[in-house]
Amino acid sequence: MLPATLLRXSGLGRVVRQARAYXEAAAAPXSAAGPGXMSFTFASPTQVFFNGANVRQVDVPTQTGAFGILASHVPTLQVL
């Protein structure tokens, strides 16, 4: 475990608290979409392509390749 002064000085304490919140959210009961499924909405400023579709995984192309998003997975930030 890291010393508390290091966590405060480097801002890592905030990151650790956020990670704990994500872990607790992932452990929460599954939504109405069913186990292993999630509600998916995809829209542009002018058009809705999917609205509340029940899906198991969303594959997303990025500038560096592609990745899959699963229900209750850790949050990520990527340029699309």
From Swiss-Prot:
Component of the ATP synthase complex composed at least of ATP5F1A/subunit alpha, ATP5F1B/subunit beta, ATP5MC1/subunit c (homooctomer), MT-ATP6/subunit a, MT-ATP8/subunit 8, ATP5ME/subunit e, ATP5MF/subunit f, ATP5MG/subunit g, ATP5MK/subunit k, ATP5MJ/subunit j, ATP5F1C/subunit gamma, ATP5F1D/subunit delta, ATP5F1E/subunit epsilon, ATP5PF/subunit F6, ATP5PB/subunit b, ATP5PD/subunit d, ATP5PO/subunit OSCP. GO terms for biological process: aerobic respiration; mitochondrial proton-transporting ATP synthase complex assembly. GO terms for cellular component: mitochondrial inner membrane; proton-transporting ATP synthase complex. Keywords: ATP synthesis, CF(1), Hydrogen ion transport, Ion transport, Membrane, Mitochondrion, Mitochondrion inner membrane, Transit peptide, Transport. Pfam families: ATP-synt_DE_N. Belongs to the ATPase epsilon chain family. The lineage of its organism: Eukaryota, Metazoa, Chordata, Craniata, Vertebrata. Gene3D superfamilies: F0F1 ATP synthase delta/epsilon subunit, N-terminal (2.60.15.10). It is found in: Mitochondrion; Mitochondrion inner membrane. GO terms for molecular function: proton-transporting ATP synthase activity, rotational mechanism; structural molecule activity. PANTHER family: ATP SYNTHASE DELTA/EPSILON CHAIN, ATP SYNTHASE SUBUNIT DELTA, MITOCHONDRIAL. This is ATP synthase F(1) complex subunit delta, mitochondrial. Residues 1-22 form a transit peptide. Its main location: mitochondrion. Subunit delta, of the mitochondrial membrane ATP synthase complex (F(1)F(0) ATP synthase or Complex V) that produces ATP from ADP in the presence of a proton gradient across the membrane which is generated by electron transport complexes of the respiratory chain. ATP synthase complex consist of a soluble F(1) head domain - the catalytic core - and a membrane F(1) domain - the membrane proton channel. These two domains are linked by a central stalk rotating inside the F(1) region and a stationary peripheral stalk.
